[in-house]
Amino acid sequence: MDHHLLEIIACPICNGKLHFDKKNLELICQTDELAYPISNGIPVLLESHARDLSSLEKK
């Protein structure tokens, strides 16, 4: 994931910072406890496509 892109995109719900999860190829919003998928290198920042973080991932 391009570090410059991570600096300019934000969570569509809270406008908070997103963190790249390299293992799962997702962008994580810790504030809303959501993970957004990356499909073919493109972040899918739609709430309907996000998944809730598990209790282990929230730590």
From Swiss-Prot:
Signal peptide: none
Coiled-coil ranges from the UniProt annotation: none
Alphabetical list of Gene3D superfamilies matching this protein: 2.20.25.10
One Pfam match: Trm112p
InterPro entries listed in its UniProt record: Trm112-like
Disulfide-bond pairs as recorded: none
Any one annotated GO CC term: cytosol
Family of the protein in this entry: Belongs to the UPF0434 family.
PANTHER family named in the record: PROTEIN PREY, MITOCHONDRIAL, ZGC:162634
Protein name listed in UniProt: UPF0434 protein HDEF_0234
Organism (species): Hamiltonella defensa subsp. Acyrthosiphon pisum (strain 5AT)
